[in-house]
Amino acid sequence: MAFIKENELLPQRPIILVLYGPPGTGKTSMACTAENPLLIDTDRGFDRACQRVDTITANKWEDIYNAENLGNTETKGIISNYSTIITDTAKACLDDYLSAYVVQLNYKLATNSLKRFGEMADQFRAFVNILRAAGKDIIFICHDKETQDGDVIRHAPDCTGQSKDLLMRIADMVGYIYMNNGKRVLSFEPTDTRVGKNTAQLPTIEIPQYGSEDFKYFCKKIIEDVKKAIQSNGEAQQQALKAIEEANAELVQCETVEAANKLAEKAKKLAPVARKAFCLKMVKELKAKGITVNPETKKFEKLEKPTEKEEVTK
């Protein structure tokens, strides 16, 4: 168990990356440019990849299961020798191999799809958690599933309903590989027409040509960038929370127009998600202290008390 104090920098952790796209876009070749990869081939397509790496050709879930020696904690499995584990494809791994495996364990699950998917989810999570605990980055490759919605074609990873939901939940990043003006492009940003997940807020990236020096470690660099972004996001959130706490403390002590205007300038630097709520709170609490905002100058000033004549007029 790791204990992380609020003022400590978040440690880098292994990530889960999902890549999907049409045939021929080089999904497997790109994934194999990750650091020290092992490819678990469940789709019989490893020999088409431009970038050849060490490969397990799995025929059933037990091949993957036994490769890691999940049932034997004393002996390290083959997977332990690698930094990145690539599963190609996730659909065959989950919908075919793992589904058949849980039915083999309990034949009643063959006719009970709800419980079968529940058992599949438990087995899959256990496998993923062991890999993550061992510090392995994981890449799941999927085909592109196109669905027609009127004149619009929508794209999503090809995986059966609940298996896809499980994959999307555990993934840190989901990227779509496609051709754009003859060049291969990778985008993690979700749109109206395609599924994506962009935790690290990476821009759309042009994939380098195979054989170039940039392509050789392309996926390794992406994974490094994602890890750094997740780590820095945690640090940024910590700094944002600290800034809000300090602003609230100053608001409690704020009694003068000068202090109010200084606090207003600080409020402009708060994180956008918290800025509006704090400004509304500031206006309300300062008004109770006799300090209000001039609508013309947008500055705080002393709330003038009405004269006796004005009171009579009212």
For each of these PLM feature ranges, what is it?
Residues 6, 25, 34, 38, ...:
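Interfaces that engage single-stranded nucleic acids at replication/repair/recombination sites
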Residues 37-39, 138, 174-176:
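Short, well-ordered beta-strand core segments
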Residues 66-69, 126-129, 252, 265:
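Surface-exposed alpha-helical segments enriched in charged/polar residues
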Residues 2-87, 91-92:
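Conserved P-loop
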